[in-house]
Every structure is written in structure tokens, then in C-alpha cells.
Amino acid sequence: MKHPLPYGFAKAQQMLLEDDGRERVLWATDNTAPSALGEVLRLHAVSRVEREDSAVLTERIARVYASGESSAATVVGEVESEVDLSRLLQDLPAVEDLLEAANDAPIIRMLNALLTQAAKDGASDIHIEPYERSSAVRFRVDGTLREVVQPNRALHAALISRLKIMAELDIAEKRLPQDGRISLRIGGRAIDVRVSTLPSAHGERAVLRLLDKSESKFTLEALGMSGEVLRSFNRLVHQPHGIVLVTGPTGSGKTTTLYASLGRIDTTSTNVLTVEDPIEYELAGIGQTQVNARIDLTFGKALRAILRQDPDVIMIGEIRDFETAQIAIQASLTGHLVLATLHTNDAPSAITRLIDMGVEPYLLSSSLLGAQAQRLVRKLCPACKRVDGDGRWHPVGCAACGQSGYKGRTGVYELMVVDDALRALIHGRAAESELLAAAKTGGFVPMRDDGARLVAEGVTSFEEVLRVTRD
């Protein structure tokens, strides 16, 4: 399907011209200017004109033009033969729609193509990496890195410079790491890009984290929890006070779980405040504070200030040190519900980690409501997954999933709810093994067993569960 009208014109005039090779159909709305409509009819052999609702057509225009963009590899190939470094330093607005910048300077087109394809593929990160004789661009999709294109090594410095201009970084400083941010739109979708540059042996490398603001409406039901875990976790986040911990490595979906938890809270009658590093998504009705190392605004200092703001619920992006842990525990003991993340491998080790930080066991036993550990597993592509004779599902690979066999991700969880038996063990500084044994007696289901549920349902593969969990 071809769309002959330029994206900017189609968007502004609310017209979509579709050419399937047999006929040309022009879609318009009641807001379409008659003069623009007449001009398109004069220049193109239109078979028929159809009317559509304004909001529906606007969304459809953004969707079809975004999906119809040339691949990054194609654009990079074109750019390598026509790069014009003299236009590299053009001004670029802080927010723009990349689909409207298709005819810009070659390096700009290359970077726009990479960003557009990354958004289309659902990538969470873009890696731009220099080596001695080559360079590479890789996307992280569903938690796994894959190479997308190898641009000419001679273009690498120009690409990084263009990126620095967009992120408002110092293009002359190549010796120090730099961090910046880009706000842009791709086919009507608002996307925040966090940019990190790092000097390496063969030039600067860059990693771009993509945050799609249109996907910021989270619900606990959509995270893949089993029915029992969902019910238990929901009860925890509706307690009037105490602390709930969500644990796991970087990229395991901890912040998403906390955001979804906050979505369950009635913010009209509750004061909800967060301290984060960084603020990943803006949440309606919630006061969000970002730590800032440059001005010495740490988690601890931000939390002390938050406690003077009459909060009911406090979310802490990460407990990193004793000061933050101590304030979180004290807040939970003085009538606040505290939701926080922690870097541990499983739920029981969250308890020993806090004690190792210096938290007194008697305080922790009085305040901790529960700890949930989690990982993200890739979901089998529904278009190509196959089942063997034993009833076990396996990845295959097709065009829909980029030949990986997987498309999308979901969570595997283990939730340890603190009961009287566990409280006594925590108070007595019990070992992790004792905590785990007591939790299992109370119905605790380890993460790998939760993964087995997803395997049995055909959601993911056995190999994928083994990859992200441990014995």
C-alpha cells in the first residue's frame, strides 16, 4: 500500500491517500479544507473519496506513515554515499515529529531513521558503538540486543555529534561521559529519549533509552501475575501503613510494577509522592521528585523533604544505602505506606540485604508487609510458535517477530507475604534459608515455579524461564 501525500501535508490537512495498485482512495474529514481537497483531486487520479471521523483519521495517518518508513539499514546505505557534513550542525527544535523531517541532511535522516525504526520495533535501547575498523548499531528488543546495521566507520563521529546537538550536550567534549535528554514525536507518539555518551578506545559510544509516553498507563492485571499473587499483592498495596519491596535486577520491570501499584490508589483523597532517579513516566495526580546529584539532592534528602509534605503513600525508586533504608523504615512505622525497589535476586534476600545495610531487625520485622521478586521473560510469538509431542511450546521465528521466535514480554514473580512466623524469624536475624523454608510453609511459590505456569500455558518457553531464573 502506497501513500503518495507527504506526511506533513496529510497530517495538517487531515487527508490520507491510499494507492493499492488497483485504485486510489482519498480519505478526508469534515475539517479538510475544500481548496486542499480540490488540489489533491487535480493532481492525483483519485478513484473515490471517503469520509472519516477526524480523531480516527488523525490516528490512522500517524500509524500508517510510521509503519511505512524505510528501514534504518536502507537509509544508512543511502546516506553513506551522500553524507554532507557541512549541514550537520543545523538547528533542530527540542520537540519535532520525525516523520516530517524525512528530507533533511543525510546524517539527520540516518539518526531519524534509527529512532523511527527503534520505536516501530518496540526497542527499549539503541546502542551506537565504535570499533577499530567498523561501527555498529544495535537495538535491545524484549531484553535482547540485536544488530540492526553497521554504518560506515567514517560516519560515526558525525552521528554522535548530531546526537549531542539533539540532546543539548557539549559536542566539543569527547573525553568525559555526558548525559542528556531528547523529547520528540514519531508519528504523533510522544517519546522521551535518555542519552548517555561514554569515551572508549575508538571513539565515543552512545546508548539511548526510549520511553514511550503513550504506553504510560499501567495496570497490575497486564503484568502477568498469577491470580493468587495478584490478589495478595493488591492487598499489600492497600494497607494503611508499612513497607512493600519489589526486587530484581536492572530491567526486570520493578518500576513498572510500582507505577501500576500507584494506579490502584485513589489520588483524589490520598497524597502520593515519589522520589525517583530518573522520573520515567509522569503520573497524573501524583507528586514526583527526581534526585539530582549535581546539586546534592539525594534519595535521603528528598525523602526527608517529602515527609514534611504530609504524604499518605511514598514511592522510592531505589533503596541504595542505609540512609534511604532508615528513612523508609521510619516512615512506614509512622503511618505511611512505602513502596520501594531493591536490587536482590529473590524475595527472601531483600530482608537480609536491608539488615546488611544496617537496618535493625526489630524495626524491619515491625514494618515489612511483603517482598516481591520478579524477572521479565520473552513471550513466544503467537504467529509461529509450535508445540512438540510432549505438549511443550517452542520458538520458531517469522517476519512478525524478526525471526527471533519471541514477541513481547511478561513477568514471572515470587511474592513473600510477611506473617507472624516470618516476623519472628526476621526479629531473630534468621538466615535466608530459614526465611525461605518458613515462606514455603505459608504458601510461597518460587519464581521458577511461577515460570512453569507460563510454560504450561504456552506463553513462553522452558528455556526462557531457565535463562532468567535460578535454582
For each of these PLM feature ranges, what is it?
Residues 47-48, 271:
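Conserved beta-strand segments of alpha/beta enzyme cores
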Residues 35-39, 52, 56, 110-113, ...:
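Long, highly charged amphipathic alpha-helices
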